[in-house]
Protein backbone atom coordinates (compact mmCIF):
# COMPACT_ATOMS: atom_id res chain seq x y z
CA UNK A 1 0.00 0.00 0.00
CA UNK A 2 1.46 3.35 -1.01
CA UNK A 3 1.85 5.65 1.98
CA UNK A 4 0.73 8.65 -0.07
CA UNK A 5 -2.68 7.02 -0.56
CA UNK A 6 -3.54 6.62 3.11
CA UNK A 7 -6.60 8.42 4.46
CA UNK A 8 -5.85 11.52 6.53
CA UNK A 9 -7.11 9.79 9.68
CA UNK A 10 -4.34 7.20 9.37
CA UNK A 11 -1.67 9.88 9.69
CA UNK A 12 -3.55 11.46 12.59
CA UNK A 13 -3.61 8.16 14.47
CA UNK A 14 0.04 7.42 13.71
CA UNK A 15 1.19 10.82 14.96
CA UNK A 16 -1.19 10.98 17.94
CA UNK A 17 1.07 9.28 20.51
CA UNK A 18 -1.59 6.63 21.05
CA UNK A 19 -4.61 8.95 20.94
CA UNK A 20 -3.20 11.83 22.97
CA UNK A 21 -2.73 14.32 20.15
CA UNK A 22 -3.07 17.87 21.45
CA UNK A 23 -6.34 17.17 23.26
CA UNK A 24 -4.99 18.47 26.58
CA UNK A 25 -3.93 21.74 24.95
CA UNK A 26 -7.36 22.07 23.34
CA UNK A 27 -9.01 21.44 26.67
CA UNK A 28 -6.94 24.20 28.26
CA UNK A 29 -7.85 26.71 25.52
CA UNK A 30 -10.78 28.91 26.53
CA UNK A 31 -10.85 31.19 23.47
CA UNK A 32 -12.91 28.68 21.50
CA UNK A 33 -15.49 26.07 22.38
CA UNK A 34 -13.96 23.72 19.82
CA UNK A 35 -10.99 21.38 19.46
CA UNK A 36 -8.56 21.52 16.55
CA UNK A 37 -9.50 19.72 13.34
CA UNK A 38 -7.15 16.82 14.03
CA UNK A 39 -8.19 16.45 17.66
CA UNK A 40 -11.84 16.33 16.57
CA UNK A 41 -11.03 12.92 15.11
CA UNK A 42 -9.05 11.74 18.14
CA UNK A 43 -11.63 12.71 20.75
CA UNK A 44 -13.96 10.13 19.21
CA UNK A 45 -11.75 7.39 20.67
CA UNK A 46 -12.34 9.00 24.07
CA UNK A 47 -16.09 8.71 23.55
CA UNK A 48 -17.34 12.02 22.23
CA UNK A 49 -18.01 14.05 19.09
CA UNK A 50 -17.82 17.78 18.53
CA UNK A 51 -21.15 19.21 17.36
CA UNK A 52 -22.93 22.53 17.09
CA UNK A 53 -26.56 23.63 17.25
CA UNK A 54 -27.57 23.72 13.59
CA UNK A 55 -30.82 25.52 14.44
CA UNK A 56 -28.69 28.50 15.53
CA UNK A 57 -25.88 28.23 12.97
CA UNK A 58 -27.05 30.97 10.58
CA UNK A 59 -28.08 33.32 13.39
CA UNK A 60 -24.67 33.07 15.03
CA UNK A 61 -22.94 33.54 11.69
CA UNK A 62 -24.84 36.80 11.17
CA UNK A 63 -23.75 37.88 14.65
CA UNK A 64 -20.13 37.06 13.69
CA UNK A 65 -19.96 34.44 16.43
CA UNK A 66 -18.45 31.00 16.11
CA UNK A 67 -20.96 28.13 15.98
CA UNK A 68 -22.46 27.16 19.33
CA UNK A 69 -20.12 24.23 19.84
CA UNK A 70 -20.99 21.44 22.22
CA UNK A 71 -20.19 17.77 22.56
CA UNK A 72 -22.07 14.51 22.45
CA UNK A 73 -20.58 12.00 24.88
CA UNK A 74 -21.50 8.33 24.69
CA UNK A 75 -20.84 5.82 27.46
CA UNK A 76 -19.56 2.28 27.10
CA UNK A 77 -22.05 -0.01 28.82
CA UNK A 78 -21.71 -3.57 27.53
CA UNK A 79 -25.11 -5.18 27.15
CA UNK A 80 -26.80 -2.04 28.44
CA UNK A 81 -26.77 -3.10 32.10
CA UNK A 82 -26.29 -0.58 34.88
CA UNK A 83 -27.20 -0.35 38.56
CA UNK A 84 -29.77 2.06 40.04
CA UNK A 85 -26.88 3.90 41.72
CA UNK A 86 -25.19 4.35 38.36
CA UNK A 87 -28.45 5.53 36.81
CA UNK A 88 -28.84 8.19 39.50
CA UNK A 89 -25.34 9.47 38.71
CA UNK A 90 -26.09 9.44 34.97
CA UNK A 91 -29.28 11.40 35.64
CA UNK A 92 -27.52 13.97 37.85
CA UNK A 93 -24.93 14.64 35.15
CA UNK A 94 -27.65 15.15 32.53
CA UNK A 95 -29.48 17.62 34.77
CA UNK A 96 -26.48 19.62 35.94
CA UNK A 97 -23.83 19.51 33.22
CA UNK A 98 -25.58 19.39 29.83
CA UNK A 99 -27.69 21.98 28.02
CA UNK A 100 -30.11 19.31 26.78
CA UNK A 101 -30.98 18.28 30.36
CA UNK A 102 -31.78 14.83 29.04
CA UNK A 103 -30.44 11.31 28.60
CA UNK A 104 -30.57 9.75 25.14
CA UNK A 105 -30.86 5.96 25.02
CA UNK A 106 -29.14 4.71 21.88
CA UNK A 107 -29.72 1.93 19.36
CA UNK A 108 -26.64 0.18 20.77
CA UNK A 109 -27.81 -0.21 24.37
CA UNK A 110 -26.05 2.66 25.98
CA UNK A 111 -26.75 6.29 26.80
CA UNK A 112 -25.36 9.52 25.47
CA UNK A 113 -25.46 13.17 26.46
CA UNK A 114 -25.99 16.09 24.11
CA UNK A 115 -25.15 19.72 24.65
CA UNK A 116 -22.00 19.42 26.74
CA UNK A 117 -19.81 22.55 26.76
CA UNK A 118 -16.10 21.82 26.47
CA UNK A 119 -15.45 23.06 30.01
CA UNK A 120 -17.72 20.31 31.43
CA UNK A 121 -16.22 17.33 29.60
CA UNK A 122 -13.61 16.49 32.20
CA UNK A 123 -16.05 16.82 35.10
CA UNK A 124 -18.53 14.49 33.40
CA UNK A 125 -15.90 11.84 32.63
CA UNK A 126 -14.62 11.98 36.21
CA UNK A 127 -18.15 11.75 37.60
CA UNK A 128 -18.82 8.70 35.42
CA UNK A 129 -15.54 7.14 36.52
CA UNK A 130 -16.57 7.40 40.17
CA UNK A 131 -19.52 5.15 39.28
CA UNK A 132 -17.36 2.64 37.33
CA UNK A 133 -18.61 3.99 34.00
CA UNK A 134 -16.54 5.35 31.14
CA UNK A 135 -16.66 6.47 27.53
CA UNK A 136 -13.47 4.76 26.32
CA UNK A 137 -13.88 3.43 22.79
CA UNK A 138 -17.56 4.38 22.61
CA UNK A 139 -16.67 6.04 19.29
CA UNK A 140 -13.66 5.94 16.94
CA UNK A 141 -11.87 3.26 14.90
CA UNK A 142 -12.14 0.61 17.59
CA UNK A 143 -14.59 -1.97 18.88
CA UNK A 144 -17.67 -0.01 19.97
CA UNK A 145 -20.24 -0.82 22.66
CA UNK A 146 -20.97 -4.56 22.63
CA UNK A 147 -24.68 -5.34 22.46
CA UNK A 148 -26.40 -8.25 24.16
CA UNK A 149 -30.00 -9.36 24.30
CA UNK A 150 -31.44 -8.20 27.65
CA UNK A 151 -33.80 -11.21 27.62
CA UNK A 152 -35.75 -10.49 30.80
CA UNK A 153 -37.49 -13.89 30.81
CA UNK A 154 -34.68 -16.42 30.34
CA UNK A 155 -32.51 -14.76 32.94
CA UNK A 156 -30.03 -17.63 33.38
CA UNK A 157 -29.20 -17.74 29.68
CA UNK A 158 -29.09 -13.96 29.55
CA UNK A 159 -26.51 -13.87 32.33
CA UNK A 160 -24.31 -16.35 30.48
CA UNK A 161 -24.60 -14.43 27.22
CA UNK A 162 -24.05 -11.14 29.02
CA UNK A 163 -20.85 -12.50 30.58
CA UNK A 164 -19.45 -13.07 27.09
CA UNK A 165 -20.56 -9.64 25.91
CA UNK A 166 -18.77 -8.10 28.89
CA UNK A 167 -15.62 -10.13 28.19
CA UNK A 168 -15.67 -9.09 24.54
CA UNK A 169 -16.01 -5.46 25.57
CA UNK A 170 -13.24 -5.60 28.16
CA UNK A 171 -10.80 -7.63 26.04
CA UNK A 172 -11.13 -5.38 23.00
CA UNK A 173 -10.50 -2.13 24.87
CA UNK A 174 -7.56 0.01 23.74
CA UNK A 175 -4.59 -0.30 26.09
CA UNK A 176 -3.39 3.31 25.75
CA UNK A 177 -3.38 5.32 28.97
CA UNK A 178 -4.32 8.53 27.14
CA UNK A 179 -7.88 8.51 28.51
CA UNK A 180 -6.75 8.14 32.12
CA UNK A 181 -4.01 10.75 31.75
CA UNK A 182 -6.13 13.45 30.12
CA UNK A 183 -9.47 12.98 31.87
CA UNK A 184 -8.66 11.27 35.18
CA UNK A 185 -5.37 13.06 35.90
CA UNK A 186 -3.33 9.88 35.98
CA UNK A 187 0.42 10.34 35.75
CA UNK A 188 1.67 10.24 32.17
CA UNK A 189 3.50 7.04 31.35
CA UNK A 190 6.74 7.27 29.41
CA UNK A 191 7.02 4.50 26.84
CA UNK A 192 10.33 3.24 25.56
CA UNK A 193 11.18 2.89 21.89
CA UNK A 194 9.56 -0.21 20.43
CA UNK A 195 7.33 -0.86 23.44
CA UNK A 196 4.09 -2.56 22.44
CA UNK A 197 1.37 -0.26 23.76
CA UNK A 198 -1.49 -1.72 21.70
CA UNK A 199 -0.92 -5.48 21.23
CA UNK A 200 -4.21 -5.99 19.34
CA UNK A 201 -4.88 -2.64 17.69
CA UNK A 202 -1.38 -1.46 16.88
CA UNK A 203 -0.44 2.18 16.46
CA UNK A 204 -3.12 2.95 13.86
CA UNK A 205 -5.98 1.01 15.48
CA UNK A 206 -8.64 -0.27 13.05
CA UNK A 207 -9.38 1.19 9.63
CA UNK A 208 -12.89 2.09 10.79
CA UNK A 209 -15.40 1.47 13.58
CA UNK A 210 -16.17 -2.12 14.53
CA UNK A 211 -19.46 -3.30 16.05
CA UNK A 212 -20.23 -6.53 17.92
CA UNK A 213 -23.43 -8.07 19.24
CA UNK A 214 -24.49 -11.18 21.13
CA UNK A 215 -27.98 -12.47 20.27
CA UNK A 216 -30.05 -14.93 22.28
CA UNK A 217 -32.58 -16.63 19.96
CA UNK A 218 -35.39 -16.46 19.23
CA UNK A 219 -34.97 -12.74 19.92
CA UNK A 220 -33.02 -10.63 17.46
CA UNK A 221 -33.49 -7.28 19.16
CA UNK A 222 -29.76 -6.61 18.74
CA UNK A 223 -30.10 -6.92 14.94
CA UNK A 224 -27.17 -9.31 14.99
CA UNK A 225 -26.78 -9.46 11.19
CA UNK A 226 -26.23 -5.71 10.95
CA UNK A 227 -23.03 -5.92 13.01
CA UNK A 228 -19.43 -6.36 11.91
CA UNK A 229 -19.28 -9.40 14.16
CA UNK A 230 -22.11 -11.26 15.82
CA UNK A 231 -22.49 -14.26 18.09
CA UNK A 232 -25.83 -16.09 18.05
CA UNK A 233 -26.20 -18.10 21.25
CA UNK A 234 -26.70 -21.86 21.02
CA UNK A 235 -28.10 -23.46 24.16
CA UNK A 236 -28.62 -26.99 25.38
CA UNK A 237 -31.41 -26.70 27.90
CA UNK A 238 -30.61 -23.59 29.94
CA UNK A 239 -26.87 -23.82 29.31
CA UNK A 240 -25.00 -21.75 26.75
CA UNK A 241 -22.68 -24.13 24.87
CA UNK A 242 -21.54 -22.07 21.91
CA UNK A 243 -22.36 -19.57 19.20
CA UNK A 244 -23.11 -19.40 15.52
CA UNK A 245 -20.67 -16.72 14.40
CA UNK A 246 -21.68 -14.15 11.78
CA UNK A 247 -19.51 -11.39 10.32
CA UNK A 248 -19.54 -8.66 7.71
CA UNK A 249 -22.66 -6.67 8.49
CA UNK A 250 -22.96 -2.90 8.53
CA UNK A 251 -25.52 -0.25 7.65
CA UNK A 252 -23.59 2.78 6.44
CA UNK A 253 -23.54 3.93 2.83
CA UNK A 254 -23.23 7.19 0.88
CA UNK A 255 -25.98 8.65 -1.29
CA UNK A 256 -25.07 8.42 -4.96
CA UNK A 257 -22.00 6.21 -4.50
CA UNK A 258 -22.83 2.68 -5.65
CA UNK A 259 -19.51 1.35 -4.35
CA UNK A 260 -20.98 1.80 -0.87
CA UNK A 261 -23.88 -0.29 0.42
CA UNK A 262 -25.41 -1.71 3.59
CA UNK A 263 -24.85 -5.41 4.13
CA UNK A 264 -25.99 -8.20 6.41
CA UNK A 265 -23.43 -10.49 7.99
CA UNK A 266 -22.50 -13.90 6.59
CA UNK A 267 -22.92 -17.11 8.61
CA UNK A 268 -19.47 -18.60 9.21
CA UNK A 269 -20.37 -21.58 11.38
CA UNK A 270 -20.54 -22.79 14.95
CA UNK A 271 -17.85 -22.22 17.59
CA UNK A 272 -17.59 -23.43 21.19
CA UNK A 273 -18.32 -20.83 23.83
CA UNK A 274 -14.82 -21.06 25.31
CA UNK A 275 -13.31 -20.09 21.94
CA UNK A 276 -15.34 -16.89 21.55
CA UNK A 277 -12.58 -14.44 22.44
CA UNK A 278 -10.09 -16.19 20.13
CA UNK A 279 -12.44 -15.87 17.19
CA UNK A 280 -13.32 -12.26 17.99
CA UNK A 281 -9.66 -11.28 18.15
CA UNK A 282 -8.94 -13.14 14.92
CA UNK A 283 -11.68 -11.33 13.01
CA UNK A 284 -10.66 -7.97 14.42
CA UNK A 285 -6.96 -8.43 13.64
CA UNK A 286 -7.72 -9.59 10.09
CA UNK A 287 -9.71 -6.40 9.64
CA UNK A 288 -6.79 -4.47 11.14
CA UNK A 289 -4.39 -6.04 8.64
CA UNK A 290 -6.59 -6.38 5.54
CA UNK A 291 -9.01 -3.47 5.87
CA UNK A 292 -8.95 -0.50 3.50
CA UNK A 293 -6.96 2.39 4.99
CA UNK A 294 -7.04 4.48 1.82
CA UNK A 295 -10.76 5.22 1.48
CA UNK A 296 -12.75 5.43 4.72
CA UNK A 297 -16.02 5.00 2.83
CA UNK A 298 -14.85 1.48 1.92
CA UNK A 299 -13.06 0.57 5.13
CA UNK A 300 -15.66 -1.37 7.14
CA UNK A 301 -15.31 -5.14 7.54
CA UNK A 302 -18.15 -5.79 5.07
CA UNK A 303 -16.04 -4.40 2.23
CA UNK A 304 -13.00 -6.39 3.36
CA UNK A 305 -14.99 -9.64 3.14
CA UNK A 306 -16.45 -8.72 -0.26
CA UNK A 307 -13.00 -7.83 -1.59
CA UNK A 308 -11.18 -10.94 -0.36
CA UNK A 309 -14.08 -13.37 -0.61
CA UNK A 310 -15.93 -15.33 2.04
CA UNK A 311 -13.86 -18.53 1.74
CA UNK A 312 -10.55 -16.67 1.90
CA UNK A 313 -11.67 -14.72 4.95
CA UNK A 314 -12.97 -17.86 6.65
CA UNK A 315 -9.71 -19.70 5.99
CA UNK A 316 -7.74 -16.84 7.53
CA UNK A 317 -9.89 -16.91 10.68
CA UNK A 318 -9.27 -20.64 11.03
CA UNK A 319 -5.55 -20.14 10.43
CA UNK A 320 -5.26 -17.46 13.12
CA UNK A 321 -7.31 -19.36 15.70
CA UNK A 322 -6.05 -22.83 14.84
CA UNK A 323 -9.68 -23.98 15.08
CA UNK A 324 -12.06 -25.08 12.32
CA UNK A 325 -15.63 -23.85 12.24
CA UNK A 326 -18.24 -26.52 12.81
CA UNK A 327 -21.44 -26.46 10.72
CA UNK A 328 -23.78 -23.82 12.08
CA UNK A 329 -26.43 -25.06 14.48
CA UNK A 330 -30.13 -24.66 13.78
CA UNK A 331 -31.62 -21.74 15.68
CA UNK A 332 -34.78 -19.72 15.14
CA UNK A 333 -34.31 -15.99 14.54
CA UNK A 334 -37.49 -14.17 15.49
CA UNK A 335 -38.82 -10.87 16.77
CA UNK A 336 -36.68 -7.73 17.01
CA UNK A 337 -39.04 -5.89 19.34
CA UNK A 338 -39.03 -5.54 23.12
CA UNK A 339 -41.45 -7.29 25.47
CA UNK A 340 -43.35 -4.33 26.91
CA UNK A 341 -44.93 -4.44 30.32
CA UNK A 342 -44.33 -6.97 33.08
CA UNK A 343 -42.68 -10.34 32.42
CA UNK A 344 -41.67 -12.87 35.05
CA UNK A 345 -38.24 -14.46 34.83
CA UNK A 346 -37.19 -17.99 35.64
CA UNK A 347 -35.89 -16.72 38.99
CA UNK A 348 -39.44 -15.55 39.85
CA UNK A 349 -38.41 -11.89 39.79
CA UNK A 350 -40.28 -9.49 37.53
CA UNK A 351 -39.04 -7.26 34.72
CA UNK A 352 -40.83 -4.14 33.50
CA UNK A 353 -40.03 -2.96 29.97
CA UNK A 354 -40.87 0.71 29.47
CA UNK A 355 -41.36 2.32 26.07
CA UNK A 356 -39.25 5.48 25.71
CA UNK A 357 -40.23 7.42 22.58
CA UNK A 358 -37.09 8.06 20.54
CA UNK A 359 -34.97 6.98 23.51
CA UNK A 360 -35.22 10.51 24.92
CA UNK A 361 -35.35 10.46 28.73
CA UNK A 362 -36.59 13.91 29.61
CA UNK A 363 -39.35 15.59 31.56
CA UNK A 364 -41.98 16.35 28.94
CA UNK A 365 -45.22 18.25 29.68
CA UNK A 366 -47.52 15.72 31.33
CA UNK A 367 -44.84 13.03 31.09
CA UNK A 368 -41.98 13.63 33.54
CA UNK A 369 -40.08 10.55 32.35
CA UNK A 370 -36.70 11.58 33.70
CA UNK A 371 -38.11 12.29 37.16
CA UNK A 372 -39.97 8.98 37.05
CA UNK A 373 -36.88 6.91 36.33
CA UNK A 374 -35.00 8.85 39.00
CA UNK A 375 -37.65 8.01 41.59
CA UNK A 376 -37.65 4.36 40.53
CA UNK A 377 -33.85 4.23 40.81
CA UNK A 378 -34.05 5.50 44.39
CA UNK A 379 -36.05 2.44 45.50
CA UNK A 380 -35.20 -0.28 42.96
CA UNK A 381 -32.91 -3.11 44.11
CA UNK A 382 -32.30 -4.82 40.75
CA UNK A 383 -30.77 -3.30 37.67
CA UNK A 384 -31.61 -1.11 34.68
CA UNK A 385 -31.20 -2.61 31.21
CA UNK A 386 -31.11 -0.40 28.14
CA UNK A 387 -32.38 -2.07 24.98
CA UNK A 388 -31.32 -1.72 21.37
CA UNK A 389 -34.81 -0.39 20.63
CA UNK A 390 -34.02 2.67 22.78
CA UNK A 391 -36.15 1.48 25.70
CA UNK A 392 -35.38 0.59 29.29
CA UNK A 393 -36.11 -2.44 31.45
CA UNK A 394 -36.52 -2.19 35.22
CA UNK A 395 -35.13 -5.68 35.83
CA UNK A 396 -35.08 -7.97 38.84
CA UNK A 397 -38.11 -6.64 40.73
CA UNK A 398 -39.29 -8.89 43.61
CA UNK A 399 -43.03 -9.55 43.71
CA UNK A 400 -43.27 -7.50 46.90
CA UNK A 401 -41.95 -4.38 45.10
CA UNK A 402 -43.98 -4.75 41.92
CA UNK A 403 -46.84 -2.45 42.95
CA UNK A 404 -44.42 0.26 44.11
CA UNK A 405 -42.46 0.26 40.83
CA UNK A 406 -45.61 0.18 38.71
CA UNK A 407 -47.14 3.01 40.71
CA UNK A 408 -44.12 5.23 40.15
CA UNK A 409 -44.06 4.37 36.45
CA UNK A 410 -47.74 5.24 36.01
CA UNK A 411 -47.48 8.40 38.10
CA UNK A 412 -44.76 9.76 35.80
CA UNK A 413 -46.22 8.76 32.44
CA UNK A 414 -43.89 5.81 31.87
CA UNK A 415 -46.88 3.45 31.73
CA UNK A 416 -50.48 3.83 30.66
CA UNK A 417 -50.14 5.12 27.11
CA UNK A 418 -51.24 2.65 24.42
CA UNK A 419 -48.29 1.72 22.22
CA UNK A 420 -49.13 0.13 18.88
CA UNK A 421 -47.13 -2.82 17.61
CA UNK A 422 -45.67 -0.64 14.86
CA UNK A 423 -44.56 2.15 17.19
CA UNK A 424 -43.12 -0.40 19.58
CA UNK A 425 -40.97 -1.88 16.81
CA UNK A 426 -39.77 1.41 15.31
CA UNK A 427 -36.72 3.58 16.00
CA UNK A 428 -35.06 6.77 14.75
CA UNK A 429 -31.64 8.38 15.09
CA UNK A 430 -31.06 11.79 16.71
CA UNK A 431 -30.36 13.75 13.47
CA UNK A 432 -31.08 17.51 13.70
CA UNK A 433 -30.23 19.81 15.35
CA UNK A 434 -27.02 18.32 16.77
CA UNK A 435 -25.75 15.72 14.30
CA UNK A 436 -23.39 17.26 11.75
CA UNK A 437 -24.20 14.56 9.18
CA UNK A 438 -27.99 14.85 9.22
CA UNK A 439 -29.65 15.92 5.98
CA UNK A 440 -33.19 15.74 7.37
CA UNK A 441 -35.09 15.38 10.64
CA UNK A 442 -35.49 12.05 12.42
CA UNK A 443 -36.06 11.94 16.20
CA UNK A 444 -38.01 15.23 16.37
CA UNK A 445 -40.27 14.34 13.41
CA UNK A 446 -40.64 10.57 13.68
CA UNK A 447 -43.36 10.36 16.38
CA UNK A 448 -45.77 12.53 14.36
CA UNK A 449 -44.96 10.63 11.18
CA UNK A 450 -45.70 7.32 12.92
CA UNK A 451 -49.07 8.66 14.03
CA UNK A 452 -49.96 9.21 10.37
CA UNK A 453 -48.79 5.71 9.43
CA UNK A 454 -50.83 4.25 12.28
CA UNK A 455 -53.88 6.09 10.92
CA UNK A 456 -53.30 4.40 7.56
CA UNK A 457 -52.98 1.01 9.23
CA UNK A 458 -56.23 1.62 11.09
CA UNK A 459 -57.91 2.69 7.84
CA UNK A 460 -56.92 -0.60 6.24
CA UNK A 461 -57.75 -2.71 9.28
CA UNK A 462 -54.39 -4.03 10.45
CA UNK A 463 -53.32 -1.69 13.24
CA UNK A 464 -52.87 -4.73 15.48
CA UNK A 465 -49.96 -5.92 13.32
CA UNK A 466 -46.48 -4.49 13.73
CA UNK A 467 -44.35 -3.11 10.91
CA UNK A 468 -40.68 -2.35 11.55
CA UNK A 469 -40.24 1.30 10.50
CA UNK A 470 -36.99 3.18 10.95
CA UNK A 471 -35.89 6.70 10.11
CA UNK A 472 -32.45 8.29 9.90
CA UNK A 473 -31.35 11.77 8.91
CA UNK A 474 -28.60 10.44 6.65
CA UNK A 475 -27.43 7.15 5.10
CA UNK A 476 -24.87 6.33 7.80
CA UNK A 477 -27.54 4.09 9.26
CA UNK A 478 -27.37 4.59 13.03
CA UNK A 479 -30.98 3.41 13.47
CA UNK A 480 -30.40 0.51 11.06
CA UNK A 481 -32.94 1.76 8.46
CA UNK A 482 -31.80 -0.61 5.71
CA UNK A 483 -32.94 -3.55 7.83
CA UNK A 484 -36.45 -2.10 8.30
CA UNK A 485 -39.58 -3.19 6.48
CA UNK A 486 -40.10 0.51 5.81
CA UNK A 487 -36.88 2.51 5.88
CA UNK A 488 -36.76 6.29 5.55
CA UNK A 489 -33.34 7.84 4.97
CA UNK A 490 -32.88 11.61 4.88
CA UNK A 491 -31.86 13.13 1.54
CA UNK A 492 -32.60 16.83 2.14
CA UNK A 493 -34.74 18.88 4.55
CA UNK A 494 -38.19 17.30 4.49
CA UNK A 495 -37.18 14.71 1.89
CA UNK A 496 -36.39 11.02 2.28
CA UNK A 497 -35.54 7.95 0.29
CA UNK A 498 -38.17 5.26 0.86
CA UNK A 499 -36.89 1.69 1.18
CA UNK A 500 -39.08 -1.42 1.32
CA UNK A 501 -38.73 -5.17 1.58
CA UNK A 502 -36.63 -6.08 4.60
CA UNK A 503 -37.79 -9.06 6.61
CA UNK A 504 -39.54 -8.54 9.94
CA UNK A 505 -36.83 -10.62 11.66
CA UNK A 506 -33.88 -8.66 10.25
CA UNK A 507 -32.53 -11.41 7.96
CA UNK A 508 -32.96 -9.55 4.65
CA UNK A 509 -32.17 -5.96 3.64
CA UNK A 510 -34.64 -3.59 2.04
CA UNK A 511 -34.30 -1.88 -1.35
CA UNK A 512 -34.89 1.63 -2.69
CA UNK A 513 -38.51 2.11 -3.80
CA UNK A 514 -38.86 5.90 -4.18
CA UNK A 515 -36.15 8.54 -4.01
CA UNK A 516 -36.13 12.03 -2.52
CA UNK A 517 -39.84 12.33 -1.69
CA UNK A 518 -41.78 14.38 0.85
CA UNK A 519 -44.24 13.30 3.51
CA UNK A 520 -47.36 13.56 1.35
CA UNK A 521 -45.81 11.32 -1.31
CA UNK A 522 -44.55 8.84 1.26
CA UNK A 523 -47.97 8.53 2.88
CA UNK A 524 -49.70 8.24 -0.51
CA UNK A 525 -47.36 5.40 -1.48
CA UNK A 526 -47.93 3.61 1.82
CA UNK A 527 -51.70 4.10 1.59
CA UNK A 528 -51.78 2.37 -1.80
CA UNK A 529 -49.39 -0.38 -0.71
CA UNK A 530 -51.33 -1.06 2.50
CA UNK A 531 -54.52 -1.50 0.46
CA UNK A 532 -52.80 -4.04 -1.80
CA UNK A 533 -51.23 -5.79 1.17
CA UNK A 534 -54.53 -6.31 2.96
CA UNK A 535 -56.17 -7.56 -0.24
CA UNK A 536 -53.38 -9.87 -1.40
CA UNK A 537 -51.39 -11.02 1.65
CA UNK A 538 -51.02 -14.67 2.48
CA UNK A 539 -51.71 -16.10 5.92
CA UNK A 540 -49.15 -14.78 8.40
CA UNK A 541 -47.28 -12.81 5.72
CA UNK A 542 -45.50 -9.72 7.01
CA UNK A 543 -45.52 -6.44 5.12
CA UNK A 544 -41.84 -6.69 4.18
CA UNK A 545 -42.22 -10.20 2.82
CA UNK A 546 -45.32 -9.16 0.86
CA UNK A 547 -43.51 -6.32 -0.91
CA UNK A 548 -40.89 -8.79 -2.13
CA UNK A 549 -43.24 -11.63 -3.07
CA UNK A 550 -45.56 -9.31 -4.97
CA UNK A 551 -42.71 -7.69 -6.89
CA UNK A 552 -43.01 -4.22 -5.38
CA UNK A 553 -39.25 -4.47 -4.83
CA UNK A 554 -36.76 -7.20 -5.63
CA UNK A 555 -35.19 -9.21 -2.82
CA UNK A 556 -31.67 -8.16 -1.83
CA UNK A 557 -29.79 -11.46 -1.68
CA UNK A 558 -26.25 -10.22 -2.31
CA UNK A 559 -25.94 -6.58 -1.25
CA UNK A 560 -22.81 -5.90 -3.30
CA UNK A 561 -24.74 -6.81 -6.45
CA UNK A 562 -28.43 -6.36 -5.59
CA UNK A 563 -28.78 -3.34 -3.32
CA UNK A 564 -28.26 -0.75 -6.05
CA UNK A 565 -29.07 -3.04 -9.00
Curated annotation (Swiss-Prot):
One Pfam family it belongs to: NIR_SIR_ferr
Key words of the record: 4Fe-4S, Amino-acid biosynthesis, Cysteine biosynthesis, Heme, Iron, Iron-sulfur, Metal-binding, NADP, Oxidoreductase
UniProt keyword annotation of Iron present: yes
Catalytic reactions on record: hydrogen sulfide + 3 NADP(+) + 3 H2O = sulfite + 3 NADPH + 4 H(+)
Cofactor(s), by name: siroheme; [4Fe-4S] cluster
Organism superkingdom: Bacteria
InterPro entries listed in its UniProt record: CysI (IPR011786), NiRdtase/SiRdtase_haem-b_fer (IPR005117), Nit/Sulf_reduc_fer-like_dom_sf (IPR036136), NO2/SO3_Rdtase_4Fe4S_dom (IPR006067), NO2/SO3_Rdtase_4Fe4S_prot (IPR045169), NO2/SO3_Rdtase_4Fe4S_sf (IPR045854), NO2/SO3_Rdtase_FeS/sirohaem_BS (IPR006066)
EC number: 1.8.1.2
Stated family: Belongs to the nitrite and sulfite reductase 4Fe-4S domain family.
Role description: Component of the sulfite reductase complex that catalyzes the 6-electron reduction of sulfite to sulfide. This is one of several activities required for the biosynthesis of L-cysteine from sulfate.
Name under which the protein is recorded: Sulfite reductase [NADPH] hemoprotein beta-component
Species classification: Bacteria, Pseudomonadati, Pseudomonadota, Gammaproteobacteria, Alteromonadales
Amino acid sequence: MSEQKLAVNEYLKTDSDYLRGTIQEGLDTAVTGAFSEGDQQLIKFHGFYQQDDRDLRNERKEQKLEPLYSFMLRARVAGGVCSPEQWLAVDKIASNLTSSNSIRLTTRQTFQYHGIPKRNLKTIIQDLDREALDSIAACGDVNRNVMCNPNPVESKLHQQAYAYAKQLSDNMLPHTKAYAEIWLDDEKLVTTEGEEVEPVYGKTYLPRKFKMAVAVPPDNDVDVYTNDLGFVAVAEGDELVGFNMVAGGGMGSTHGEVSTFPRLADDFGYIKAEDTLKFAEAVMTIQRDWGNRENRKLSRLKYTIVKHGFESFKAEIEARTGIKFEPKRDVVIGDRGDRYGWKQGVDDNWHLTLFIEGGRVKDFPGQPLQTGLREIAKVHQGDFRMTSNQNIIIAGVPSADKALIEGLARQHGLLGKLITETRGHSIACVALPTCALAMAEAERYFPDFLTKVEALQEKHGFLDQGIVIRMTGCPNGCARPFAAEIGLVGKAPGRYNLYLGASFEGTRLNKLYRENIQEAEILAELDALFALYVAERQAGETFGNYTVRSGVVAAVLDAAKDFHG
